[in-house]
């Protein structure tokens, strides 16, 4: 007998709607038969005037849209953010303006590299994208379950993602592609170590941290700005899967994380995360020992402690996965007054790329879809028409300035000014202190057992690579810590002997 809410979805529908509805065509006309096509005689050919069939099949042929190029498979939920601590001295954003204030939100969790049918338990970062429906527009905080990323310059992003996808000839995942890229971009080491540690296999979506990852700016009502990073920590605790359990679930329940989230919410066991920020002044940023806008590095908590802000509660499942999750579109460019961008190059690159991919996947009016529209503030602009447009903004003028009472600006939401100097050039940053924080991760974050498990996790896929890639990666590991390189080397040699 089915026990979980996800198993009983159809039964629940039947109990909720006991009276069957008359079946119609897409234009609302009732039909008398849904079990046979229209033919000339019992054994004769179909007729082109079978509009019931044509209506059904034409829509079926167009049901799928392009899947996301990354983060293709995911789960979503609705909820709210509640302010529990006053941070108005740092930020004027409407969402934070009063303790106790609640703001509705949508979150989408996801794996990164796999296709939409891949296993939820793959060793992969997890997407952690939140859309806050604030009274001054939608704020999208598009992060991951890691505080760092593989690269610091966005020009590498397409090539990095190519290595996480399939070989274009064999159509197979290729460890040589993956590790060869990391061999040439050692700034990835910090994130790679995070990925191959126990944290690379979170136990579903409810038991993992979330991070904005990038550095942002917060601005208060007096126009004073500071730099900030966002953190989310689950009150239900962090849990990870063992390699063996993750492999078992990939076979027996590849939708494990989606199922776990849906059933928990449906049972009333609402997941909760506390939000924290780290704060760095402009003066501290100028003097800090490394580039504070480098997304391959963290801000040490001892120097920049976590400041509690509020809590995020997920309390409602989507009614329609396609409409509310598959068609949801998150974009780092979507900020609100009080939140601004930093010089983080990866953030700057994402400002363009996310909107661009939404145009490809959903069309130029994706922002008009109910799940994406800023329904608590409403959009007022001169953007009109295009595929699937239905909002003409009360037939207002589509040009500005004008003499017809349409449109005014708000001087109080002016971006803060900042100085910018330097020669225009392409500045290579591949050798910018790539080993110090990975070394701290090895020495201070991982215990003895976690180090051993991480080395074992590396040895399997790295051992399948060409010898020069193995040697190059072990050299990188040894620069992090001699014991790290030696352990992985010994494990790979042991694997090789066992295959003789």
Curated annotation (Swiss-Prot):
Chain positions recorded as heme binding sites = 354
Instruction: Give its localization.
Output: Peroxisome
Major localization listed first in the record, in broad terms: other
- The reply to whether Ion transport figures as a keyword in the UniProt entry is no
Keyword Cytoplasm among record annotations: no
List the GO molecular function terms: catalase activity; heme binding; metal ion binding; peroxidase activity
Protein name stated in the entry: Peroxisomal catalase 1
Source lineage: Eukaryota, Metazoa, Ecdysozoa, Nematoda, Chromadorea
